[in-house]
């Protein structure tokens, strides 16, 4: 468990005094107080940011204003979201929000729905079209060119995902015409970060949002979104490969650097804007390989 809070100077002082007997030395120059309480660490930064990490993080953080998230108890009548493509240099970013009701349970069991990372691409391509047809959802596909434009406008890799998850949920609520009992997002950032970035967005869902790690293992709606997003990503990568006449790999490993370098040599550096997320380190590595 990892919880981040922004506390006032007085609150940081109170925390430091309360847990002074647990204080330990930290080599990080930006940490002004560090303590280890059982299996939980408390790091107070000079900026006022406080990080609680460990099994009792939520309990200790609640003493300083953290409100514990209520984890939905039901599998159904909720919206779940997940994204794919954020870790891949080539291809766009896909975010899907899906709504699962009691009526969908039998169908999803028959389909063998699970987290997309546990399914082969072949299996995903088999079941995703059926999920798209049967399950109420909103899938947002951001092509690399649009992604690069948004990043250049001031968004970062986290805030763009917050915006997309938020918009997908908002649009799905409108599509349903009613509020789900709960909304679960497969956590890709801290709750504090999510709230900070989502406050800048124009539209907001009517239902409270819960961020959970490994939510795709706990909620079918998140697993469905994971599969649909993966399918959309694979389709997008296939389309871009055809347009570029190169087989574009998924991920951000050395192979991506080499393929990008080949594209630069044959089509020029500008061609990458249509195919890849330019702010990734792969761009500079590819330019070095291409000797630009």
Swiss-Prot record:
GO molecular function, one term: magnesium ion binding
Reaction(s) the record says it catalyses: Endonucleolytic cleavage to 5'-phosphomonoester
Residues where a divalent metal cation binds: 82-83, 186
A cellular component annotation (GO) from this entry: ribonuclease H2 complex
Manner of cofactor binding, per the entry note: Manganese or magnesium. Binds 1 divalent metal ion per monomer in the absence of substrate. May bind a second metal ion after substrate binding.
Limits of the RNase H type-2 domain: 76-292
Any Gene Ontology biological process: DNA replication, removal of RNA primer
Keywords, comma-separated and alphabetical: Cytoplasm, Endonuclease, Hydrolase, Magnesium, Metal-binding, Nuclease
Named cofactor requirement(s): Mn(2+); Mg(2+)
Gene3D superfamilies linked to this entry: Ribonuclease H-like superfamily/Ribonuclease H (3.30.420.10), TATA-Binding Protein (3.30.310.10)
Residue intervals passing through the bilayer: none
One Pfam family here: RNase_HII
SUPFAM superfamilies named among the record's database cross-references: Ribonuclease H-like (SSF53098)
Compartments, as annotated in UniProt: Cytoplasm
E.C. number(s) listed in UniProt: 3.1.26.4
Domain of life: Bacteria
Function: Endonuclease that specifically degrades the RNA of RNA-DNA hybrids.
Stored HAMAP family: RNase_HIII
NCBIfam families to which the protein is assigned, alphabetical: rnhC
Family statement drawn from the similarity comment of this UniProt entry: Belongs to the RNase HII family. RnhC subfamily.
Name of protein: Ribonuclease HIII
Gene: rnhC
């Amino acid at each position: 468990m990892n919880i981040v809070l922004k506390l006032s100077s007085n609150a940081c002082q109170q925390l430091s005094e309360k847990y002074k007997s647990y204080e330990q030395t930290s080599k990080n120059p930006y940490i002004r107080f560090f303590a280890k309480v059982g299996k939980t660490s408390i790091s107070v930064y000079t900026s006022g940011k406080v990080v609680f990490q460990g099994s009792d993080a939520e309990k200790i953080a609640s003493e300083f204003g953290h409100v514990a998230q209520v984890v939905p108890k039901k599998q159904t009548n909720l919206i779940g979201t997940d994204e794919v493509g954020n870790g891949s240099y080539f291809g766009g970013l896909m975010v899907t929000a899906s709504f699962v009701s009691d009526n969908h349970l039998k169908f999803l069991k028959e389909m063998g729905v699970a987290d997309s990372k546990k399914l082969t691409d072949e299996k995903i391509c088999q079941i995703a079209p059926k999920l798209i047809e049967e399950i109420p959802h909103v899938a947002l596909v951001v092509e690399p060119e649009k992604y690069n434009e948004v990043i250049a406008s001031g968004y970062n890799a986290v805030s763009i995902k917050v915006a997309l998850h938020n918009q997908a949920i908002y649009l799905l609520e409108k599509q349903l015409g009613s509020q789900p009992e709960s909304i679960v997002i497969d956590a890709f950032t801290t709750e504090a970060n999510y709230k900070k970035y989502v406050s800048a967005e124009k539209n907001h869902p009517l239902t409270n949002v819960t961020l959970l790690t490994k939510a795709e293992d706990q909620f079918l709606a998140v697993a469905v979104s994971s599969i649909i997003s993966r399918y959309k990503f694979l389709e997008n990568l296939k389309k871009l490969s055809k347009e570029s006449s190169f087989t574009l790999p998924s991920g951000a490993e050395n192979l991506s650097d080499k393929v990008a370098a080949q594209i630069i040599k044959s089509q020029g550096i500008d061609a990458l804007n249509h195919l890849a997320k330019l702010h990734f380190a792969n761009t500079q590595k590819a330019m070095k390989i291409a000797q630009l």
